[in-house]
């Protein structure tokens, strides 16, 4: 399970790191002054002389150092080489996107070396006469010793059948949390039993980092570089994903959120749901043109973790992923058309968007990517007094987006929006859809599609449980966010994406003068 909505120690440290990196960036110093501030951060977050979290204050500070480096876009350091925490800082002190792959990293000495899978008899065993656990074990790995069941770990295949039949729930089946959360099977153990990521499988969804109870996994960020841009006076737009609802309780209204974003340095604020409206119409056109004449099935393109998984794990289906631009790219490209010298920062729930923004075809549109959690750190680091923020009621709304566009933030929202648009154009046409959330279920969906079970369908995949509202960069409990999102959808100025005042620009953004609604 993830810990969104629960203020755990791991989450507190992660957010403190974001806050202190932001404070350092706003100080706007270079050279040795910057080095001093960076070296000071671990002592600010882990004060005193005694360790309280891992009983080793030096280890605790060393882990924070690696988190600080990653938050600034810097790589983790090798454990077998001497390297200062400030190594590479000068290269990172720029107002541009900065990090090299890999995006998601294991801090090796923070890893607890959890067993990959374990089935174990607990003290709750009553030593019952029936001992069904022994009877169902296919490997005869369970024996009777000292009046209770005992599992021979050498024979056990971790099937868990014994745990299922135990009437006292005395047998526990556990799995390494990060690996259990990874729908790609990309996490295994290294030679020392520490978690290791297979980057040939990883799609940077970030679910491992929010499910690790020891906070041993973190992704790289651009907090430092973004604020360098603010300090330089760059005109930077905040492109806010619709999943922002419920993430910032102190910024309950869109007006407050907009005021806060401008106060920390953004030039203006735009809701990415306007790009979702354009995406809906474009993807509906794609489906009508491609299925079934050219393609047996078509899959949506909005979630980068889903589309990357489809292309790497199912290369034969790569052509079935819609070529429609994602809402992030549609919105960024539109704003750059309006303000060519401005820069764009996507703010959303997603770690994988950082990877999407680094693609050759996208990097000229999107300059920075922040998660909601990183944004919370920046707001804290700026020392904003939320109560004193003045809201201009004439500019309180983010933009004009449809209910359907805002609904992209939850599982099923994309497919339903596209299907409803097709039905509106062709009332007699049946549009069959199927959706999955979480990469493990997404893989199952594509396996069935490959087997021909979904011919004629529109498939939607969301890499995170619940969709974007369950993304790795969110703060709030996804279930509560879903409730607030549905309220926000009802407050939209219109329901139909084609009513968007930006729809007339779609042919320009697609660079297709022949595109017609």
What are these regions (language model features)?
Residues 112-120, 143-148, 189, 207, ...:
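Gly-rich Lys/Arg/Thr-decorated short loops/hinges at beta-loop-alpha junctions or inter-strand turns
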Residues 121, 152, 198, 240-241, ...:
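A secondary-structure boundary/capping signal
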């Amino acid at each position: 399970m993830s810990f969104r909505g629960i203020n755990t120690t791991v989450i507190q440290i992660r957010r403190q790191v974001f806050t202190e990196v932001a404070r350092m960036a706003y100080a706007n110093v270079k050279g040795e002054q910057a080095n001093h501030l960076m070296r000071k951060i671990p002592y600010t977050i882990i004060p005193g002389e005694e360790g309280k979290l891992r009983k080793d204050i030096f280890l605790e500070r060393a882990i924070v150092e690696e988190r600080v480096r990653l938050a600034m876009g810097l790589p983790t350091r090798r454990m077998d080489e001497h390297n200062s925490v400030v190594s590479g800082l000068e290269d990172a002190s720029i107002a541009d996107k900065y990090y090299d792959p890999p995006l998601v990293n294991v801090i090796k000495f923070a890893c607890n070396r959890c067993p990959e899978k374990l089935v174990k008899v607990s003290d709750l065993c009553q030593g019952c006469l029936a001992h069904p656990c022994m009877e169902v074990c296919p490997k005869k790995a369970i024996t009777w010793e000292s009046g209770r069941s005992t599992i021979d770990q050498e024979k056990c295949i971790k099937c868990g059948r014994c745990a299922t039949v135990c009437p006292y729930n005395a047998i526990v089946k556990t799995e390494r949390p990060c690996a259990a959360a990874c729908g790609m099977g990309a996490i295994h153990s290294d030679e020392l039993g520490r978690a290791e990521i297979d980057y040939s499988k990883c799609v940077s969804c970030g679910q491992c980092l929010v499910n690790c109870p020891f906070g041993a996994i973190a992704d790289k960020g651009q907090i430092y570089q973004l604020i360098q841009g603010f300090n330089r006076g760059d005109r930077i737009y905040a492109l806010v994903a619709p999943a922002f609802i419920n993430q910032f309780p102190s910024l309950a209204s869109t007006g407050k959120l907009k005021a806060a974003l401008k106060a920390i340095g953004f030039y203006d604020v735009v809701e990415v749901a306007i790009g979702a409206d354009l995406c809906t119409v474009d993807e509906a056109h794609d489906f009508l043109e491609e299925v079934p004449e050219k393609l047996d099935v078509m899959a949506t393109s909005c979630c980068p973790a889903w589309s990357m998984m489809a292309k790497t794990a199912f290369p034969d289906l790569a052509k079935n992923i819609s070529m429609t631009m994602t809402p992030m790219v549609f919105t960024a490209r539109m704003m750059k058309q309006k303000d060519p010298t401005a820069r764009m920062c996507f703010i959303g729930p997603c770690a994988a968007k950082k990877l999407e923004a680094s693609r050759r075809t996208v990097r000229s549109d999107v300059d920075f990517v922040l998660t909601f959690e990183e944004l919370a750190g920046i707001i804290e680091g700026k020392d904003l007094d939320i109560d004193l923020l003045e809201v201009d009621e004439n500019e309180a709304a983010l933009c004009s987006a449809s209910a359907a566009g805002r609904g992209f933030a939850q599982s099923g929202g994309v497919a339903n929006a596209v299907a409803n648009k097709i039905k509106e154009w062709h009332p007699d046409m049946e549009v069959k859809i199927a959706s999955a959330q979480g990469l493990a279920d997404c893989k199952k969906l594509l396996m069935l599609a490959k087997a021909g079970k979904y011919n004629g369908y529109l498939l939607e995949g969301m890499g995170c449980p619940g969709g974007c509202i369950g993304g790795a960069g969110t703060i709030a409990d996804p279930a509560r966010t879903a409730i607030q999102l549905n309220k926000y959808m009802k407050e939209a100025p219109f329901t139909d994406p084609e009513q968007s005042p930006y729809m007339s620009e779609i042919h320009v953004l697609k660079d297709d003068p022949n595109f017609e609604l």
